[in-house]
């Protein structure tokens, strides 16, 4: 018996009305369904002789991206109608490309390769749902309006005698279309326009799934039982969810190429449960999580996913021209794309509509292909539509995203997951208009107007392009009610303590708790208490301090600081600080280098070489421009000798003298240059997250000899470049180049002490096979290079592929020289000229130091294990003067990585 596959069109987004159908598109008869005209939903019938089971058992695409999506236009009291289900034949096999649409509307979708579909609408007339595909009888089912409906169709095959057709692949026309899309990229991409101004409305929503399972406890139900009145159901996953956050933002967006402008002025914003002065508002506009498919790659949570419109799209996708439509009087191609065979990187699966005259993107619907090597994301859907402005210009119309965040990729009714939704509406575009002068003067890429969080309900009613549904309006009331439940505040405090490291009260926060207890060979057991004031005391000033005691050295240590936030946006902060504490000189910048119980446990034996440091500083941080951040500081520092890091100087050919301490009086200036960098702004902190461009830092330090003993005058300069180079599909590289020089005569604690790692914890800012105080220079240059392949190779191995491991290679190198006046190597010809003799084992770099490593990251989505080999300086001089193999020729490290 011959089995045949019936193909239709996989359509997501706007369903063509009868007047939009291209009569010459080649459809056969028998597709229509009276009284409604037949939608253009089937490809010219292609009958392929093969077993149905082999065709229909292809896996469906689905994975995730964080988004905050909204619904379509409707009245203030309109409710959203949601439908989800599956279309099968009489034997239960899923049918792909079946048109599922609401009768007498332009709303419809197509089933995926497993026969699944989902959609939602605010259209109050949508009550009859139809499933239609050539070769089967149409089926109509009435659904409940304004509610969630799960509707499964079981289509009956039409008994029609048809002759099998022989199909030969010919993708020359498809390649020509893709080439034309690439040729017209400059004119169709809105971001390549010289200037434009537009209004945006962004709505985000965060939902919690399986809420009933999480609140089974009687006490929880007694306190939070009322929230179940606000439950809803997702049309994508079919899961019931509890809305926990909603935000709305109305903004004006400015874009320009020459002069370069990329700014957003937020005119109004409100977030359920948050006050008007919150740090989250800066991320609620349209500037973040951009989905411009004209770019070669879409950056989703720092994962580069090839765009179906990419010039090299044929490497990642197989394309199928499935239809030609007449949309708004213009011929439009419908193109399906599926991941190419053998692709191990993250890719999309979906469909797009391309204008046949301008080769511009009209609509696109994508899902992240299931099995993609992305953590914490189970489902992802991106929908984007563009509109014609004027006669020949394409511009944004709507951008919708959906994501299911979960700790497991499996469906489970017991584990909670979060659904993120975002929808952006673009309105009133004006092309060719430059930004106003006052906008160009704004020092930040996202500017929040002072009255943005104080807009009333009447203002919002007029500002929205469509009204909120009743359920959406109730989210604000529900979140406010939850905040008044005492148990909620207790749970919030526990979670906040774990995340921030501080136990907060209304006016004071105790911590960080990770430093309460630690131990080292100088202090022995060490206990520390500390804390800082909270914004409940002041949002302009913050006091912090700590007190520590070592039971072995029997000494108290301590410190404190006063921060004065002059301006949060742009940043202007003045800080006064002082402390006396044990510090490790020559360490990297990793947070794991700070004193804690974990670093104490994982410290290599004999690697601790801490020094007591007494320092006072006044520092001024100033964000002059978004691309230029500066820091100016006056620092007074004194470093003390101890038995592990002794300070001695040569007084004669046969004698040395003990030096108690050395000091410096520094003027420190740092300038940091970056472009289009994403930052977070807290009340007192500013953190740098990401930039697609190199970040250059210039560090200048001048020191003058004062009235204290053993002080020195010198000048130190250092320039560094940090760049994350994206190389999809083979991952991304992190490159850091540094060069510096010290002019003057200085003791060894003030030289460039090349960064060692005294622990088994991965520190990407230090040399894993190098000890503290092993090498020093006064002229140096270094290279840190790390490449993460993102599973490019391991993803091709069947059994390992499911583990989602990611391969990493690392190269670290440094070369430096030491002038005679600073060469304090014991026994060297010029050691008597140096201010201090070097500690035993410390020397200069007489040749480049190189180490390399290989590792596997994303183990259990948390851990990373690396193995490093020391390629040079493998022999070191022992205490008896004999050269021996370094004990650090091979080192294994472990680290934590939380990445998507």
Residue ranges and their predicted role:
Residues 102-104, 130-141:
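A short, solvent-exposed loop/turn motif at the edges and junctions
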């Amino acid at each position: 018996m011959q089995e045949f596959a019936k193909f239709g069109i996989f359509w997501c987004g706007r369903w063509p009305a009868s007047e939009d159908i291209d009569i010459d598109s080649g459809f056969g008869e028998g597709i229509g369904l009276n009284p409604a005209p037949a939608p253009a939903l089937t490809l010219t019938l292609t009958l392929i002789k093969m077993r149905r089971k082999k065709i229909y058992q292809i896996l469906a695409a689905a994975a995730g991206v964080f988004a905050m999506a909204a619904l379509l236009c409707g009245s203030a009291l309109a409710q959203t109608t949601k439908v989800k289900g599956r279309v099968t034949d009489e034997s239960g096999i899923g049918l792909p490309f079946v048109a599922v649409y609401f009768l007498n509307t332009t709303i419809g979708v197509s089933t995926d390769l497993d026969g699944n579909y989902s959609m939602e609408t605010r259209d109050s007339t949508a009550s009859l749902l139809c499933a239609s595909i050539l070769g089967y009888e149409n089926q109509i089912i009435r659904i409940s309006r304004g509610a969630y409906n799960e509707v499964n169709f079981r289509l009956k095959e039409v008994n029609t005698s048809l002759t099998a057709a022989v199909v030969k692949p010919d993708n020359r026309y498809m390649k020509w279309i893709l080439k034309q899309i690439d040729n017209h990229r400059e004119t169709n991409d809105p971001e390549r326009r010289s200037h434009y101004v537009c209004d945006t409305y962004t709505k985000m929503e965060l939902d919690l799934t399986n809420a009933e399972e999480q609140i089974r406890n009687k006490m929880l139900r007694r306190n939070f039982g009322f929230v179940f009145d606000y439950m809803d159901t997702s049309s994508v996953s079919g899961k019931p969810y509890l809305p926990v956050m909603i935000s709305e933002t109305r903004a004006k967006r400015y874009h320009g190429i020459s002069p370069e402008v990329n700014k957003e002025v937020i005119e109004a914003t409100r977030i359920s449960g948050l006050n008007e002065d919150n740090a989250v508002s800066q991320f609620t506009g349209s500037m973040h999580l951009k989905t411009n498919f004209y770019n070669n790659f879409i950056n989703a949570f720092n994962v580069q996913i090839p765009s179906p419109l990419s010039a090299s799209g044929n490497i990642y996708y197989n394309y199928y021209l499935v239809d030609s439509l007449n949309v708004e009087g213009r011929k439009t191609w419908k193109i399906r794309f599926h991941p190419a065979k053998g692709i191990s990187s993250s890719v999309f699966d979906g469909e797009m509509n391309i204008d046949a005259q301008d080769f511009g993107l009209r609509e696109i619907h994508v899902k992240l292909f299931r099995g993609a090597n992305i953590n914490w994301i189970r489902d992802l859907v991106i929908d984007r539509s563009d509109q014609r402005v004027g006669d020949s210009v394409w511009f944004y119309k709507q951008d919708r995203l959906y994501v299911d965040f979960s700790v497991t990729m499996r469906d489970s009714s017991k584990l909670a997951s979060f659904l993120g939704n975002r929808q952006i509406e673009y309105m009133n575009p004006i092309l060719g208009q430059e930004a106003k002068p006052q906008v160009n003067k704004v020092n930040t890429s996202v500017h929040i107007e002072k009255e943005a969080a104080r807009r009333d309900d009447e203002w919002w009613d007029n500002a929205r392009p469509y009204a909120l549904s009743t359920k959406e309006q109730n989210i604000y009331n529900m979140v406010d009610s939850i905040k008044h439940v005492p148990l909620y505040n207790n749970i919030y405090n526990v979670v906040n303590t774990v995340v921030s490291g501080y136990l907060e009260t209304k006016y004071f926060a105790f911590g960080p708790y990770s430093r309460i207890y630690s131990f080292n060979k100088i202090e022995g057991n060490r206990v520390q208490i500390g804390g800082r004031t909270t914004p409940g005391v002041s949002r302009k000033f913050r006091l912090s301090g700590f007190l520590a005691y070592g039971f072995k050295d029997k000494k108290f240590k301590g410190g404190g600081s006063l921060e004065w936030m002059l301006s949060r946006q742009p940043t202007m902060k003045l800080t006064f600080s002082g402390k006396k504490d044990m510090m490790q000189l020559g360490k990297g910048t990793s947070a794991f280098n700070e004193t804690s119980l974990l670093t104490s446990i994982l410290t290599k034996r004999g690697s601790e070489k801490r020094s007591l440091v007494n320092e006072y500083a006044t520092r001024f941080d100033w964000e002059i421009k978004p691309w230029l951040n500066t820091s100016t500081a006056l620092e007074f520092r004194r470093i003390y000798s101890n038995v592990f890091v002794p300070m001695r100087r040569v007084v004669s050919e046969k004698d040395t003298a003990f030096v108690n301490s050395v000091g410096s009086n520094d003027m420190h200036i740092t300038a940091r240059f970056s472009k289009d960098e994403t930052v977070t702004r807290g009340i007192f902190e500013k953190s740098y997250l990401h930039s697609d461009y190199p970040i250059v830092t210039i560090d200048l330090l001048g020191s003058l000899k004062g009235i204290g003993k053993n002080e020195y005058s010198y000048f130190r300069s250092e320039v560094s470049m940090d760049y994350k180079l994206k190389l999809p599909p083979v991952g991304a590289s992190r490159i850091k180049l540094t060069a510096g020089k010290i002019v003057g005569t200085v003791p060894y604690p003030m030289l460039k002490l090349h960064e060692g790692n005294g622990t088994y914890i991965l520190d990407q800012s230090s040399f894993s096979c190098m000890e503290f105080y092993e090498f020093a220079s006064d002229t140096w240059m270094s290279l840190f290079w790390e490449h993460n392949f993102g599973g490019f190779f391991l993803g091709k191995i069947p059994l390992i592929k499911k583990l989602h491991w990611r391969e990493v290679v690392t190269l670290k190198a440094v070369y430096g020289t030491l002038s005679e006046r600073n060469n304090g190597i014991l026994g060297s010809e010029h050691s008597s000229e140096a201010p201090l003799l070097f500690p035993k084992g410390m020397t200069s770099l007489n040749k480049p130091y190189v180490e390399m490593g290989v590792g596997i990251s994303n183990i259990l989505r948390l851990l990373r294990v690396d193995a490093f080999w020391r390629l040079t300086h493998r022999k070191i001089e022992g205490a008896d003067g004999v050269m021996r193999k370094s004990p650090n020729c091979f080192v294994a490290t472990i680290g934590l990585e939380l990445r998507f």
